[in-house]
Amino acid sequence: MTTTTATPRGFGYRHPQFRLAGLLAAPMAWLVVVYLGSLFALFLTAFWTVDDFTGQLVRTFTLKNFQQVFTNTAYLSTVVRTVSIALLVTLFALVLALPLAFFMARVASPRWRPLLVALVLTPLWASYLVKVYAWRAMLQPENGVISWFLQPFGLSGPGYGFVGIVVTLTYLWLPYMVLPIYAGLTRLPNSMLDASADLGASGGRTFRSVVMPIIFPSIVAGSVFTFSLSLGDYITAQIVGGKITMLGNVVQTTYVTNLPFAAAVATIPVVIVLLYLLAVRRSGALDNL
């Protein structure tokens, strides 16, 4: 005859929800204190000002900084320019990513797909500054690689400026658009494409009516990355932008002498991204991601 001894079960075993809370306590504390805390400090500082005589912070509520941004033509044009660059980068990244991701997911053989994914990821392993300075060498107005290649045709490269920023940022963030679309295309059943062809739909009609609705959440996910990363970038504009500046450059040049104004400028990309995420959430584009 055998006897069994009851194993005592602790409080955490009887209440798994408390075990889950214990596991999440540390990362949630980090998120609240470091991430949300820094955002709160940023928003709070944006409503302060600086004494013109002493240069000290004046901790009184004011909208002066935001009024200066949206009433000063130079700052307002910088806001419009930054948003335009982010939109163009997202658009060009999408145009390049769609055929590339489609080839990787639907045309290339399964044995080559891991290699193609690795090739897309390879630029992310290189230093950000190395990649930007490489594009600086290519975009040089006189001795750059692009100008050297176009000279026999009587053309010249874009040089430094608006176009250089868009081209460089598109290269930097392209993998963030390719990978979500590739993941979405791998989930596309072959039976749906076959059914569309059997019903007499052309390739373009199949792409518009079958493929696009399925990969649209993936496109939105990729656009969140490319749009938000472009909005907050300032190093690329500093290296290949010439005289063109973005919001990040304004923050960089003003935070030492006027921290509240720099904080107000820094809140603009944050608010724009939050509004974009809210619109995406309300549209339900990410529900099936």
Predicted regions span which residues?
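Transmembrane-helix boundary motif in ABC transporter permease subunits
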Residues: F11-G12, L88-L121, S191-L193, L278-A285
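Transmembrane alpha-helices
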Residues: A25-G37, T122, Y171, M177-N190, ...
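Short membrane-interfacial helix/loop motifs at transmembrane-helix boundaries
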Residues: T3, L36-T73, M138, E142-N143, ...
